């Protein structure tokens, strides 16, 4: 895959739609080979490739650094967990899986309430939605849960007086991710994995027709 021709918006869209259930890459692979990029275009291409390929590792690193910085503040740790959950809701696969599990659990106690939490049906034309698909969680657009989670996180951080620590941890985690993604040389496995996921996406779209 030619990452030079991939825009940043396309990478964000791919991260939102791709499956995050895959296990993280091994530490041996994660810390295998490092080198400075030869040019700005090479750096941008490497950055986009690594952010996509090591997405699970970066998410774990992000949560770990955030939790480590707030280990002495239980409320702030809870806020960090809510932040991680809210960000995970932005991924289509995670949000849909969470929604199904919640509805399945609620159905055991109240089938009528579970039926109301089902997302509304979208008009379909030739196997595709007429409008851009909206992901629902418990009958509400996922943006509602994302905003509620982030608001609750901010309140917990402010209450625990850990807001500055949170900003410090966020900055540290993002810098570590940016540094690794900039210096880690993409290997053949990363390229082959990208081609495989591209094929799956094309086949999925073809099967929906």
Swiss-Prot record:
Keyword hit for Membrane: yes
UniProt KW keywords: Endosome, Membrane, Transmembrane, Transmembrane helix, Transport
GO CC list: endoplasmic reticulum; endosome membrane
Subcellular location: Endosome membrane
Name of the protein in question: PRA1 family protein A3
GO biological process, one term: vesicle-mediated transport
Residue ranges of the TM segments: 51-72, 76-98, 143-163, 164-184
Topology with respect to the bilayer: Multi-pass membrane protein
Family: Belongs to the PRA1 family.
Classification via InterPro entries: Prenylated_rab_accept_PRA1
Chief location of this protein within or outside the cell: membrane
Disulfide bonds: none
Lineage of origin: Eukaryota, Viridiplantae, Streptophyta, Embryophyta, Tracheophyta
The organism's place on the tree of life at top rank: Eukaryota
Taxonomic source organism: Arabidopsis thaliana (Mouse-ear cress)
């Amino acid at each position: 895959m030619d990452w030079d021709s991939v825009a940043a918006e396309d990478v964000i869209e791919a991260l939102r739609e791709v499956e995050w259930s895959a296990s993280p890459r091994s530490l041996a692979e994660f810390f295998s080979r490092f080198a400075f990029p030869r040019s700005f275009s090479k750096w941008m291409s490497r950055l986009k490739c690594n952010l996509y390929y090591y997405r699970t590792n970066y998410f774990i690193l992000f949560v770990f650094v955030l939790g480590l910085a707030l280990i002495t503040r239980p409320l702030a740790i809870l806020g960090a967990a809510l932040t991680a959950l809210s960000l995970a809701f932005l991924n289509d696969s995670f949000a849909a899986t969470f929604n199904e599990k919640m509805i399945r659990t609620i159905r055991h106690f109240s089938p009528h309430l579970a039926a109301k939490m089902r997302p509304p049906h979208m008009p379909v034309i030739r196997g595709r939605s007429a409008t851009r698909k909206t992901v629902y969680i418990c009958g509400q657009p996922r943006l509602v849960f994302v905003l509620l989670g982030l608001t609750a996180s901010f309140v917990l951080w402010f209450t625990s007086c850990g807001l500055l620590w949170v900003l410090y941890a966020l900055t540290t985690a993002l810098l570590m991710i940016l540094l690794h993604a900039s210096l880690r040389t993409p290997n053949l496995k990363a390229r082959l994995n990208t081609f495989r996921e591209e094929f799956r996406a094309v086949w999925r779209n073809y099967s929906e027709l």
